[in-house]
């Protein structure tokens, strides 16, 4: 809780109600977030599964795939009313450092909208439009973090065409 000192009163406190968020990338639809009653059990489950995984430096592709699923799961739990993506990005930087990778928060800051949108897509499912969880953008983000800084992260490629009746929107131009 000390990292939340001098912030909003609700900072660092699990949310006490269910929520929805209108997502621009989904034409106003929302991800289905975890029921607030289950936040702690979901986080305990995901953290206990991930903490037992070990990766050699040669297994970076496996790490990227696992990291995308793990991050998606804890983000979809959406523990707090505000600040979930920022909190998770800091946590992932610390986790990657623990695993021996030299990373900082710059790429998360410089591509914050892409990162958030990739988390949305990895957590979104809509059978009516034949849309399933898409981890590819999140995998690409982690590839950029760990392997190839030259990878382009373009928000305009992330919109869900089926939700816009094939009328492609212009996504916000923030990184």
Q: Can you describe what each PLM-predicted range is?
A:
Residues 1-175:
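FIC/Doc superfamily catalytic core
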């Amino acid at each position: 809780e000390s990292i939340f000192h001098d912030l909003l009163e609700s900072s660092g406190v699990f949310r006490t109600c269910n929520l929805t968020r209108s997502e621009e990338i989904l034409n106003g639809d929302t991800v289905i977030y975890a029921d607030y009653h289950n936040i702690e059990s979901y986080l305990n489950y995901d953290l206990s599964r991930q903490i037992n995984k070990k990766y050699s430096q040669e297994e970076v592709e496996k790490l990227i795939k696992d990291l995308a699923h793990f991050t998606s799961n804890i983000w979809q739990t959406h523990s707090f009313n505000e600040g979930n993506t920022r909190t998770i990005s800091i946590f992932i930087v610390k986790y990657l450092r623990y695993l021996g990778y030299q990373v900082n928060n710059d790429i998360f800051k410089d591509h914050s909208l892409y990162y958030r949108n990739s988390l949305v897509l990895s957590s979104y499912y809509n059978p009516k439009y034949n849309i399933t969880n898409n981890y590819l953008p999140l995998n690409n983000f982690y590839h950029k973090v760990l392997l190839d800084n030259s990878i382009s992260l373009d928000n305009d490629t992330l919109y869900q065409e089926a939700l816009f009746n094939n009328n492609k929107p212009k996504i916000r131009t923030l990184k």
